[in-house]
Amino acid sequence: MIKAVLFDLDGTLTDTIQDISDAMNHALRLHDLPGWTVAEYCYLVGDGAKTLAKRAVRDRQDLALSVQKAYQAYYETHNLVTSKPYDGIPEMLDELQKRGYKLAVFSNKPDADTKNVVAHYFPQVKWDVVRGQVGGVPVKPDPMGALAVADVLGVAPDEVLYLGDTATDMNCARNAGMHPVGVLWGFRKEDELRDSGAEVIIAHPREIFTAQKL
C-alpha cells in the first residue's frame, strides 16, 4: 500500500528551466564560453550542478569547477525569476495532503536552492521532508538519498510512489525499490521514461489518482 509520495523538483513540480538556463549562461559568459538554448538545457540538467557545469563547458573541463561556482552563486539569488509550478500541481498536492499521504521532495539541486524554491511556491503544503543535494550523499540515481528520505518518513521503500521527469529519477526509484512514475509535462520524452523503467506514465497531475488508485 502506498503511504508516501516523493517528488523530484525541476521538471516535476516546477518549471525551472528558464532560470537554470539563464544562470548557467551567465556563468558561461563570465568565462567567455558559449551558452546553450533552453531546449538544450532540458537534456543537460538532472544530475546535479557539478555534472551540469561539466556538460555546459563542453571541452573546457579545466573551467568546469569555476563555472559551477559562478552558476551556483548567481542561481542562489535568481531562482525565483521565471520559475513556476506546473498546471495542476498545487491541486494535486492539496488532494494528496487531504488524503493523508506523506509528502516529500528529493532533488539533485543544491539543498538550499531546493528548500527555497519549494517554500516559495508551495507554502500551503505541509511537507514531511524537503531535501536537495548535500555533501556526503551521492546524487541520483544512487538510491542513498531516496532511501534516507524514506527512513525519515518512516515508510518502507515499496510504500513510496516516486514522481519524476527523467531517466535519472526512474532509475533512482528502481534502485531504491520504490514505484517510479514518469511525468510528461517535464523536461524529457515518454520513450526515455519507459526505457528507464517507469511503472506508470502520466500526462497531467490529476492522472496520478486514477493511474495508481490513490
Where in the sequence are the language-model features?
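N-terminal helical cap/lid subdomain that shapes the substrate entry/recognition surface
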Residues: 2-94, 99-101, 110, 124
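Generic enzyme active-site microenvironment
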Residues: 6-8, 106, 163
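Asp-based, Mg2+/Mn2+-dependent phosphohydrolase catalytic module
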Residues: 1-3, 39, 110-111, 115-214
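Hydrophobic, well-ordered secondary-structure segments
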Residues: 27, 70-81, 104, 134-138, ...
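Short, surface-exposed connector motifs at secondary-structure boundaries
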Residues: 95-102, 156-157, 174
